[in-house]
Amino acid sequence: MLVTKLAPDFKAPAVLGNNEVDEHFELSKNLGKNGVILFFWPKDFTFVCPTEIIAFDKRVKDFHEKGFNVIGVSIDSEQVHFAWKNTPVEKGGIGQVSFPMVADITKSISRDYDVLFEEAIALRGAFLIDKNMKVRHAVINDLPLGRNADEMLRMVDALLHFEEHGEVCPAGWRKGDKGMKATHQGVAEYLKENSIKL
């Protein structure tokens, strides 16, 4: 489990948003002001994967506005990533997504993040990594279960709220909701006002 630990750094080839290839793309050199969303998918040119990639890409601006970059990883080569980006959506491609797509051809990144499945492909892992490279949230889905990019945005908002106000974010918390002081009195006050909504 990586939550609360430093995220494993890596250097690998990546296809950038402008379709250039960075042969030495490093996670630690590509954090946003507040951190990064690092997500894995099993394989290019498959089925659930393009829906997730397109969903994250449609929200890249939202993540950037919150100070987070988005980086994707699969075990495919940079050439396969490039081909998939240049395949139209209506033909099963992903189109010109704007975030870097890392080529984990050695599978070492997937292994380091504990998402490598049967030494073959990555499970659907997603990691919220803060500006200090600490993993603050992780979710790993089985192959048939797609992730929700909006839930990752919610987790980003929760982390930013905690960092700014020092309040913890209870179940179902959304930006604009009241946080909770992490004390016995704080939880009692919160539950008195909000337990019916939980």
UniProtKB/Swiss-Prot annotation:
Family membership noted in the UniProt record: Belongs to the peroxiredoxin family. AhpC/Prx1 subfamily.
Gene Ontology CC: cytosol
An example molecular function term from Gene Ontology annotations: thioredoxin peroxidase activity
Catalytic activity: a hydroperoxide + NADH + H(+) = an alcohol + NAD(+) + H2O
Further remark: The active site is a conserved redox-active cysteine residue, the peroxidatic cysteine (C(P)), which makes the nucleophilic attack on the peroxide substrate. The peroxide oxidizes the C(P)-SH to cysteine sulfenic acid (C(P)-SOH), which then reacts with another cysteine residue, the resolving cysteine (C(R)), to form a disulfide bridge. The disulfide is subsequently reduced by an appropriate electron donor to complete the catalytic cycle. In this typical 2-Cys peroxiredoxin, C(R) is provided by the other dimeric subunit to form an intersubunit disulfide.
EC number: 1.11.1.26
List of catalytic residues: C49 (cysteine sulfenic acid (-soh) intermediate)
Gene for this chain: ahpC
Compartment(s) where it occurs, according to its Swiss-Prot or TrEMBL record: Cytoplasm
Enzyme class: oxidoreductase
Keywords: Antioxidant, Cytoplasm, Disulfide bond, Oxidoreductase, Peroxidase, Redox-active center
Species in which this protein is naturally found: Helicobacter pylori (strain J99 / ATCC 700824) (Campylobacter pylori J99)
GO BP annotation list: cell redox homeostasis; cellular response to stress; hydrogen peroxide catabolic process; response to oxidative stress
Cross-referenced InterPro entries: AhpC/TSA (IPR000866), Peroxiredoxin (IPR050217), Peroxiredoxin_AhpC-typ (IPR024706), Peroxiredoxin_C (IPR019479), Thioredoxin-like_sf (IPR036249), Thioredoxin_domain (IPR013766)
PANTHER family xref list: THIOREDOXIN PEROXIDASE, THIOREDOXIN-DEPENDENT PEROXIDE REDUCTASE, MITOCHONDRIAL
Function: Thiol-specific peroxidase that catalyzes the reduction of hydrogen peroxide and organic hydroperoxides to water and alcohols, respectively. Plays a role in cell protection against oxidative stress by detoxifying peroxides.
Keyword field contains Cytoplasm: yes
The protein's assembly and partners: Homodimer; disulfide-linked, upon oxidation. 5 homodimers assemble to form a ring-like decamer.
Protein's UniProt name: Alkyl hydroperoxide reductase C
Domain named Thioredoxin: residues: 2-161
